[in-house]
């Protein structure tokens, strides 16, 4: 306090008391007010939790009630109740303290009382020894007195009753004298002599009573002659024994009064202590119960205790058989060993879905650097072999026990199926072989107990000793996995994943379903056909070699037939291979040539092409386009004149059908015509060589005319309209077609025209499709295609030039290449022929 006052008196810290920034939050604002319904959390044991260690591991003694009191407080309306409760709690604490003090006092008094009891026991033993003699004499007298009574009772029962009453009175007198002889004041004293007397009398009377009860039935059981007595005699004897017992009980009561008077103070104190203990226990039980009544959430207060109702329910609903499944405890019986080996066993997995490649991919992802997993093999277990043999004959045993009329939602049948699925996990086991024990231990540490994807099947790994070998054939083997092409499996185990169990005994293989539903590519289908239908020659040779030697001497005719059939099969296989190779080559060519073109050479065009080449070499093609046009027109006129002349000659040669050749006039005329024909034939024969050359020229000219027929039908066009109509929808085009206003784009560009070659080479005429002024028309598309071809040609020429340069350096004496101008000319001719064919197709349409 003095230090605080010094700090507050210091001028530097005075403003701390006045500045609100340094004030502490008041308790009313710091604590959250709660309703009286939640007051039990301050004192109820359910909400109490003791902390032994703090968050940093240091030992502390702290509880949750302190935290609750720190942050919560009852509202003002419930503060009175909280005061009352605090009083009750204080009372309870005081009682608990009393209990503790009493227990401590009892623990101190116990050794003193034990010493007193030991002294009393020694005194009692002395008194008992004295009275044992008297009791033994009394028992003998009773035996002697009862024997003649049994005989007399058979003759006269009245005498027996009178004698018994007299004996009874005598005994009462003795007991009265013995009690009256003692002074009354001394009964409640604590002297050793009186207490010994009282205790000895009580002990002797109780012992005598026991001896009588044990001896009397034995005496009454048999007569002196060894015969059983009558029922009347037995009844009388039992009455007499009961009367004797009652007399002795009265004596015991008198003695016990003396005893109680002596020990009354001690018994009262003990009773008070017992009552207090019982009250305290009841209070503790009441404390255990929460103030809010039964806590149904924690399972308190909702238990019915009526046994009759339970019996009735048991009669109505008989107990169902219990099923204990090994949830996550399938490896509880596995022995533990410290030895680490390089082989691992994988157990208790869903083997209907998992394959060896899945496990190999998993282990490869967890192996250490430099570690190798050689293989994963799946073997059938002994248990699995036995069960699978049974299932082949009669199916699963669990299914046989389920009735056919059982409903689908029957719990017992469902749990039987679940039990079968759990057993099915043990049908197989996998063996993973690693390069060293270090890789195996690393995989074991990372993967043991791990869930495979989201399948609810957990990996159970175990080390396999080196001396164990596996003779069975593996079900599945995986040596390598392509992790780039591997696709993981997503599934849930039928036994552990869902409440409704799906049996997997007769289930189709999921890989088969996926392969059948998958869309295959052409290459994959061809590979599958090769694998399915074609066998390699090496396999055939092996099969022939494996044939047993004993069968070599079989019928020769049969061997010949088999050889022929084998040859036929081989021939068919060879043909099939050739067909497949041809198909594959065609597909490869189609893939290589992105621009698929078909060039057809029509017979007769070859000659025209040769003439064009000659004209080119002679220099005739150097004419201007206008001059070429005029020459073509002249040639057309010449051809027309020739055709007319031929037609006139044919008309002259023709004669009417009604002409009578017997008439002398017509006969002379016919002779004249024959002479003319002969003269014409002779003239033709003379000029046959010249005509042949002319005919060849005519053919070339006809070809040129056919190519340029459409040039006569040239017309003007509106470029803007063509662009507009090209971008219209189908409906609007149909409307314009009806009105005959649709402008069709019939314009075809002569791409091979030499005047426009700069469009393909110069950057000044480059076409930019991304430009807003660019209009996509048929002509533009052709120009772009031609430009792409020019680029390809340039690349080819460059490659050829490089190859030639290499060849020239290596082989200087090689032929010179063809003139590039000629090669370009040939290419242009080919292009023209293609255009010609395209026009022909349009005409046909």
Curated annotation (Swiss-Prot):
Q: Which GO terms describe its biological process?
A: rRNA processing
* Pfam families per record: NUC153, RRM_ESF1
Per UniProt, the ranges with Low complexity bias are 194-206
Instruction: Provide GO CC annotations from the record.
Output: nucleolus; nucleoplasm
Give the sites modified to N-acetylserine.
2
Q: Which residues carry this modification: Phosphoserine?
A: 75, 77, 79, 82, 136, 156, 200, 290, 292, 306-307, 608, 651, 657, 686, 688-689, 729
Q: Biased-composition ranges for Basic and acidic residues?
A: 64-73, 102-140, 149-166, 558-567
What residue spans carry the region label Disordered? 54-321, 536-570, 634-660, 676-696
Write the record's keywords in alphabetical order, separated by commas: Acetylation, Coiled coil, Nucleus, Phosphoprotein, Transcription, Transcription regulation
The record's subcellular locations are: Nucleus, Nucleolus; Nucleus, Nucleoplasm
In this UniProt entry, the residues modified to Phosphothreonine are 305
In this chain, composition skew of type Basic residues spans 90-101, 634-644
Coiled-coil region: 775-803
Q: Where is the composition biased (Acidic residues)?
A: 231-255, 263-292, 306-318, 538-552, 648-660
Provide the function of this protein: May constitute a novel regulatory system for basal transcription. Negatively regulates ABT1.
What do we know about how this protein assembles, alone or with others?
A: Interacts with ABT1. Forms a complex with ABT1 and suppresses the ABT1-induced activation of polymerase II-directed transcription in mammalian cells.
> Which family, according to UniProt?
Belongs to the ESF1 family.
Q: What's the protein here called?
A: ESF1 homolog
Q: Write down the species.
A: Mus musculus
Q: Gene behind this chain?
A: Esf1
């Amino acid at each position: 306090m003095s230090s605080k006052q010094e700090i507050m008196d210091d001028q530097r810290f005075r403003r701390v008391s006045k500045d609100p920034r340094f004030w502490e939050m008041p308790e009313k604002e710091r604590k959250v007010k709660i309703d009286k319904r939640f007051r039990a959390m301050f004192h109820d044991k359910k909400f109490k939790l003791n902390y032994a260690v703090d968050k940093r591991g240091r030992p502390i003694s702290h509880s949750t009630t302190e935290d609750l009191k720190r942050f919560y407080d009852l509202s003002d309306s419930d503060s009175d109740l909280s005061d009352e409760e605090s009083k009750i709690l204080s009372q309870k604490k005081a009682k608990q303290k009393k209990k503790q003090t009493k227990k401590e006092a009892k623990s101190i008094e116990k050794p003193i009382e034990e010493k007193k009891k030991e002294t009393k026991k020694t005194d009692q033993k002395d008194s008992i020894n004295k009275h044992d003699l008297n009791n033994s004499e009394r028992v003998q007298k009773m035996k002697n007195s009862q024997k003649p009574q049994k005989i007399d009772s058979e003759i006269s029962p009245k005498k027996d009753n009178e004698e018994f009453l007299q004996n009874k009175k005598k005994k009462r007198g003795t007991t009265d004298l013995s009690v009256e002889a003692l002074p009354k004041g001394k009964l409640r004293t604590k002297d050793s002599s009186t207490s010994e007397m009282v205790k000895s009398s009580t002990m002797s009377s109780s012992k005598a009573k026991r001896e009588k009860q044990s001896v009397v039935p034995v005496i009454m059981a048999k007569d002196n002659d060894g015969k059983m007595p009558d029922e009347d005699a037995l009844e009388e004897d039992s009455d007499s024994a009961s009367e004797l017992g009652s007399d002795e009980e009265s004596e015991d009561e008198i003695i016990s009064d003396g005893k109680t008077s002596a020990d009354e103070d001690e018994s009262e104190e003990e009773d008070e202590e017992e009552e207090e203990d019982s009250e305290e226990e009841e209070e503790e039980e009441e404390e255990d119960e929460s103030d809010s009544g039964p806590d149904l959430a924690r399972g308190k207060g909702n238990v019915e205790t009526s046994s009759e109702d339970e019996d009735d329910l048991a009669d109505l609903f008989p107990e169902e058989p219990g099923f204990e499944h090994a949830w996550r405890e399938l490896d509880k019986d596995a022995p533990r060993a410290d030895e680490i080996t390089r082989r691992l066993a994988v157990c208790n997995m869903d083997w209907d879905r998992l394959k060896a490649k899945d496990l190999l991919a998993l282990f490869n992802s967890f192996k250490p650097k430099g570690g190798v997993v050689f293989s994963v093999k799946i073997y059938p277990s002994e248990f699995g072999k036995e069960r699978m043999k049974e299932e082949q004959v009669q199916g699963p045993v669990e299914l046989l026990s389920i009735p056919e009329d059982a409903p689908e939602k029957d719990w017992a049948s469902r749990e039987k199926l679940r039990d079968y699925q759990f057993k099915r996990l043990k049908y197989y086991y996998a063996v993973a072989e690693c390069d060293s024990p270090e890789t195996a231990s690393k995989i074991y540490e990372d993967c043991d107990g791990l869930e495979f994807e989201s399948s609810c099947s957990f990996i159970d790994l175990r080390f396999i000793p080196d001396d164990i070998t596996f003779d069975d054939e593996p079900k599945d083997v995986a040596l390598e996995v392509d992790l780039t092409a591997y696709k993981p499996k997503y599934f849930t185990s039928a036994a552990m994943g869902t409440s409704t169990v799906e049996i997997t005994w007769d289930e189709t293989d999921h890989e088969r379903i996926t392969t059948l539903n998958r869309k295959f590519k052409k290459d994959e289908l061809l590979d599958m056909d090769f694998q399915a239908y074609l066998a390699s020659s090496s396999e055939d040779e092996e099969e022939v070699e494996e044939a047993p030697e004993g069968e070599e001497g079989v019928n020769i005719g049969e061997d010949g037939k088999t050889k022929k059939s084998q040859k036929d099969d081989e021939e068919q296989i060879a043909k099939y291979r050739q067909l497949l190779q041809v198909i594959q080559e065609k597909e490869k060519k189609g893939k290589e040539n992105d621009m698929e073109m078909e060039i057809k050479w029509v017979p007769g065009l070859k000659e025209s092409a040769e003439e064009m080449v000659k004209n080119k070499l002679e220099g005739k093609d150097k004419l201007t386009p206008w001059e070429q046009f005029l020459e073509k027109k002249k040639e057309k006129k010449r051809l027309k004149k020739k055709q007319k002349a031929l037609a006139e000659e044919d008309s002259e040669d023709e004669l009417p059908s009604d002409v009578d050749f017997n008439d002398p006039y017509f006969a002379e005329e016919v002779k004249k015509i024959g002479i003319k024909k002969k003269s014409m034939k002779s003239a033709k024969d003379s000029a046959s060589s010249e005509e042949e050359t002319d005919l060849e020229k005519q053919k070339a000219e006809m070809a040129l005319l056919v190519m340029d027929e459409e040039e006569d039908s040239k017309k003007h066009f509106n470029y803007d309209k063509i662009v507009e109509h090209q971008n219209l929808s189908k409906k609007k085009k149909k409307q314009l077609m009806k009105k005959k206003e649709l402008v069709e784009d019939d314009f075809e560009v002569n791409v091979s025209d030499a005047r426009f070659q700069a469009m393909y080479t110069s950057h000044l005429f480059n076409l930019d499709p991304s430009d807003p002024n660019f209009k996509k028309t048929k002509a533009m598309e052709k120009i772009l295609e031609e430009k792409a071809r020019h680029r390809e040609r340039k690349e080819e020429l460059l490659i050829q030039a490089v190859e030639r340069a290499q060849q020239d350096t290596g082989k200087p004496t090689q032929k010179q290449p063809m003139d590039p101008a000629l090669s370009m000319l040939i290419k242009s001719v080919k292009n023209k022929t293609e255009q010609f064919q395209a026009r022909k197709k349009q005409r046909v349409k």
